């Protein structure tokens, strides 16, 4: 993505960015007004209008992209503009996107967000298709895109950060989209190890080490699969001195059949995405390292497969977690919280972080409560919860806080152990969060239930993928706004 300086043209449509896609030549500003008038283009956010002209210099396609009311743009609107623009590129070889608005200066970070929206919209996961663009009518090549904006210096600088974040989102999407026969716990860990090239310290703990640590909850989930579990620890040291780290923990169930409490066959294929939390944490660590974030950050992901073989754990089993707390397994399909129990305690005990945020595709109940446009937010710390909420509003990866309380906590008490892993039908996402809360002590903590947003969420202008990469941009924004020194 290149940036080029562009002054204010003498004639312009006041609510549109312009995308001339051409072999040669540049259309005059007067064409823009004419296209808008003829097409009835209103400039509504994300709407487009286009015209194709044949000139002595070649063929030119001009596209107008609506930006809505400039003074009201916010959240992820600039990403939507970029995504809408990219959707119109087609087979153009060279593209120039001119960003300019009347009586308004487009800031460098806004221009970078437009470019980020284009990058995210360009993503597709088609590595297993043997016949690609020919049958889908997709471009056979990548267009060379130049973004014209008044302040090129700040735009380029902002895009260096945005590009690193895009790399993190794309990695998260790739991991979630990958089929489970290709991506098991070992293979996922190998992908995380590649972050060492960016300066991330990566440590992979195998089954022997996990047994030595006493991670009975995580190992109980893994024991039904022939694929061995892994716990991956990623460390990024970007702050000066010995500043306490911030920590992110992800659930990484690479495939979830439900175990002995097996799921229905319908839509079980989607459970290849039950590691969306671990994917987001891995993508976040890539983003932080890629942009050289000035913070010390820890990413921990627990990687298992939940299968129903003769050695699988049973309903009624009691396991001992690394914390020493015992858990009665009521439902083997409530396995993610068992993985997180040990991962959370390990992270808290080893690193003593300033806070812990965990991400997990944990419950279907959160989708019943919130649908697929908000992730569930639970926290024992109001300040952290508010910071996360604000980051969600800024990025468009929105959160909605749900309650915790002693009444819900009592629902997971067990007659035979310290707690049980399922409290039944009602308040399912809340009781799951209460379960996790028992493993973080007094450390500020937040749990993001991303079951409805990490995979299969509705497409938008900058995401047409089944896997969204939800959480990477959200948490990167949180780190930038609140915790970088």
UniProtKB/Swiss-Prot annotation:
Its cofactor is Mn(2+). It catalyses: Release of an N-terminal amino acid, Xaa-|-Yaa-, in which Xaa is preferably Leu, but may be other amino acids including Pro although not Arg or Lys, and Yaa may be Pro. Amino acid amides and methyl esters are also readily hydrolyzed, but rates on arylamides are exceedingly low; Release of an N-terminal amino acid, preferentially leucine, but not glutamic or aspartic acids. InterPro entries: Leucine_aapep/pepB, Macro_dom-like, Peptidase_M17_C, Peptidase_M17_leu_NH2_pept, Peptidase_M17_N. Mn(2+) 1 binds at residues 256, 333, 335. Keywords: Aminopeptidase, Cytoplasm, Hydrolase, Manganese, Metal-binding, Protease. One of its GO terms (biological process) is proteolysis. Belongs to the peptidase M17 family. This is Probable cytosol aminopeptidase. It comes from Brucella melitensis biotype 1 (strain ATCC 23456 / CCUG 17765 / NCTC 10094 / 16M). The lineage of its organism: Bacteria, Pseudomonadati, Pseudomonadota, Alphaproteobacteria, Hyphomicrobiales. The gene is pepA.
């Amino acid at each position: 993505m290149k940036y080029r300086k562009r002054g204010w043209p003498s004639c312009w449509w006041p609510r549109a960015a312009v995308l001339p896609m051409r072999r040669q030549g540049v259309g005059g500003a007067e064409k823009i007004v004419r296209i808008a008038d003829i097409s009835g283009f209103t400039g509504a956010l994300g709407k487009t209008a286009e015209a194709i002209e044949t000139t002595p210099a070649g063929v030119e396609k001009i596209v107008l992209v609506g930006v809505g009311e400039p003074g009201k743009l916010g959240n992820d609107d600039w990403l939507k503009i970029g995504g809408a623009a990219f959707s119109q590129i087609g087979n153009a070889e060279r593209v120039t996107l001119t960003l300019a608005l009347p009586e308004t200066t487009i800031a460098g970070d806004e221009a970078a967000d437009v470019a980020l929206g284009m990058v995210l919209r360009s993503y597709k996961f088609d590595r297993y298709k043997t016949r690609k663009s020919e049958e889908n009518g997709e471009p056979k090549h990548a267009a060379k895109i130049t973004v014209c904006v008044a302040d090129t210096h700040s735009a380029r600088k902002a895009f260096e950060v945005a590009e690193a974040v895009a790399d993190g989102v794309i990695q998260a999407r790739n991991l979630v989209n990958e089929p489970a026969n290709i991506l098991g716990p070992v293979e996922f860990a190998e992908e995380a190890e590649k972050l060492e090239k960016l300066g991330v310290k990566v440590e992979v703990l195998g089954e022997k080490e996990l047994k030595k640590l006493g991670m009975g909850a995580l190992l109980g989930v893994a024991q039904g699969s022939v694929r061995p579990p892994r716990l991956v620890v990623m460390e990024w040291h970007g702050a000066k001195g010995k500043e306490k780290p911030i920590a992110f923990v992800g659930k990484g169930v690479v495939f979830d059949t439900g175990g002995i409490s097996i799921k229905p066959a319908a839509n079980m294929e989607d459970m290849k995405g039950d590691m969306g939390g671990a994917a987001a944490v891995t993508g976040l660590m890539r983003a932080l390292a890629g942009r050289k974030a000035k913070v010390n950050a820890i990413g921990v992901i627990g990687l298992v497969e939940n299968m129903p073989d003769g050695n699988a754990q049973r309903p009624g089993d009691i396991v001992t977690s690394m914390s020493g707390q015992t858990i009665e397994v009521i439902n083997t399909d409530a396995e993610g919280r068992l993985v997180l129990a040990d991962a959370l305690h390990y992270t808290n005990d080893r690193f003593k972080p300033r806070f812990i945020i965990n991400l997990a595709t944990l419950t279907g109940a959160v989708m019943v409560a919130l649908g697929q446009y908000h992730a569930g937010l639970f926290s024992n710390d109001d300040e952290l919860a508010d910071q996360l909420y604000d980051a969600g509003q800024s990025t468009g990866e929105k959160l909605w806080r749900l309650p915790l309380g002693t009444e819900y906590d009592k629902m997971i008490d067990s007659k035979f152990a310290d707690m049980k892993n399922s409290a039944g039908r009602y308040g399912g996402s809340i009781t799951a969060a209460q379960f996790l809360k028992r493993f973080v002590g007094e450390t500020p903590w937040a749990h993001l239930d991303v079951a409805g947003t990490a995979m299969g969420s509705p497409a938008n202008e900058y995401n047409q993928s089944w896997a969204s990469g939800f959480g990477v941009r959200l948490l990167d924004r949180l780190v930038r706004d609140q915790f970088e020194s």
